Swiss-Prot record:
GO molecular function: lyase activity
Primary localization class, coarse: membrane
Keyword Glycoprotein: no
Subcellular location per the Swiss-Prot or TrEMBL entry: Membrane
Source organism: Aspergillus fumigatus (strain ATCC MYA-4609 / CBS 101355 / FGSC A1100 / Af293) (Neosartorya fumigata)
Protein topology in the membrane: Single-pass membrane protein
A GO cellular-component term linked to this record: membrane
Protein known as: Isonitrile hydratase-like protein xanA
Active site: 131
Length: 236
């Protein structure tokens, strides 16, 4: 007699910082909030529980949207093992350059998350970067010998940046322009790495992640609800 498998739920940490690109973090959140076991928009049994994380209680995104965050960085660090997924959005290059150069606590949070042991042996945690958020992941020293993507204008800069960060002898990442890349489990760390290119491609990557953690049918359902034409692995 077959039994129904238990429902799975995932806790998501969405890392924010001043000047963050709006769609980089709101697009994954939109996809995740539509993911429910019962597909009931009025009373959803949501698969993903989302928490925004930042160094301050409020974050101004692109000087256009003020977000009240759920957790401060230090509180998130204390409860980091509770999370299954970390979303790392991007921002304008000048902002990311300045942020990375300051050796921020955000980088330590990313590194700590990526090196946590899996919650279950058969399902690693997921580190999901969008656009120039890959530079924060790179600053954590995690992009060694893996395939990644980022905004098309930042491809060469990310490769050069990681070579500097990783140092001599370390394998550089293979950086190419695709809608998203699932690199599998990191060579440095224990998390599964998913990277998305510029801005709107994170919709495709988010739907892909949902298909991996739930089902392809669920992602197709969400794309219909969102009236979005889900794109696959496009190189241009």
């Amino acid at each position: 007699m077959s039994s129904t498998p238990p429902k799975k739920y995932y806790k998501v940490a969405v890392l924010l910082f001043e000047g963050v690109d709006i769609l980089d973090f709101t697009a994954p959140m939109e996809v995740f909030t539509h993911t429910s076991h019962n597909r009931n928009p009025d009373n959803p049994d949501r698969v993903f529980q989302i928490n925004t994380i930042a160094r301050s209680r409020t974050v101004n995104a692109k000087k256009a949207l003020t977000v009240q965050t759920d957790l401060l960085l230090e509180d998130a660090m204390q409860g980091l093992a509770d999370f299954d997924i970390m979303v790392v959005p991007g921002g304008p290059p000048s902002l990311l350059n300045a942020l990375v150069a300051s050796n921020p606590r955000e980088v330590e949070l990313i590194r700590s998350f990526a090196t946590l042991p899996p919650k279950t042996p058969d399902e690693p945690r997921v580190l999901f970067s969008i656009c120039t958020g890959a530079f924060l992941v790179g600053a954590a020293g995690l992009l060694t010998g893996v395939s990644v993507t980022t905004h098309h204008r930042a491809i060469e800069k990310l490769r050069e940046f990681c070579i500097r960060v990783n140092g001599e002898g370390a394998s550089p990442p293979e950086v190419s322009h695709k809608r998203y890349i699932d690199a599998g489990v990191l060579k440095v760390g224990s998390a599964r790495l998913l990277t998305a290119a510029g801005v709107s491609s994170c919709l495709d990557a988010s739907l892909y992640l949902v298909s991996q953690l739930t089902s392809l049918d669920m992602s197709a359902f969400i794309s219909r609800v969102m009236e979005y034409d889900w794109k696959g692995q496009l190189s241009e």
